[in-house]
Regions:
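Alpha-helical transmembrane segments and their immediate juxtamembrane interface regions
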Residues: 85-125
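Juxtamembrane inter-helical linkers in multi-pass membrane proteins
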Residues: 32-47, 121-126
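Membrane-water interface of transmembrane alpha-helices
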Residues: 20-38, 109-113
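Membrane interfacial helix-start motif at the N-side
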Residues: 42-63
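Long, highly hydrophobic alpha-helical transmembrane signal-anchor segments
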Residues: 1-14, 72-97
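Helical transmembrane-bundle signal
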Residues: 11-22, 66-76, 99-106, 110
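N-proximal short alpha-helices
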Residues: 6, 17, 21-27, 40-44, ...
Length: 126
């Protein structure tokens, strides 16, 4: 049972990190454009405007997807209660790997939104 609780916590880690960082980024981007923390792509780092836009947009998507992922991520874990460490670990692994898609997919949507709202040089399209 202890391993099952541990795996449930691991399975919820990605959704709750998405919610937390989504809230943080949607409310405010890191103060300075940097290559260490934040949503960092060549387009988002063009200027202050693209930096703030990208963080707000990406943060909203991550927060929403994090909440959407939380419950469906835990439900399959109930099917392996008391089944032993191998089935519990395998289920946790499958869930965690499936969470990588919604973790990474918002990058493509954010880049598309940046290209829609800004030109190649980072100037806002009116």
């Amino acid at each position: 049972m202890g391993f099952w609780i541990f795996m449930c916590a691991i399975v919820l880690l990605i959704p709750f990190l998405m919610i937390s960082f989504g809230n943080l980024f949607s409310k405010s981007a890191p103060k300075e454009i940097n290559s260490a923390f934040g949503y960092r792509t060549s387009m988002s780092m063009k200027n202050e405007d693209t930096w703030k836009f990208a963080h707000h947009y990406f943060g909203q998507i991550w927060r929403t997807l994090g909440w959407i992922l939380a419950v469906p991520s835990v439900i399959p874990m109930f099917f392996v209660i008391g089944k032993g460490n191998d089935p519990v670990g395998n289920m946790g692994l499958i869930i965690t790997f499936s969470q990588l898609i919604p973790l990474i997919l918002p990058i493509f949507f954010t880049e598309k939104a940046l290209r829609k709202h800004f030109d190649r040089n980072g100037n806002r399209i009116l």
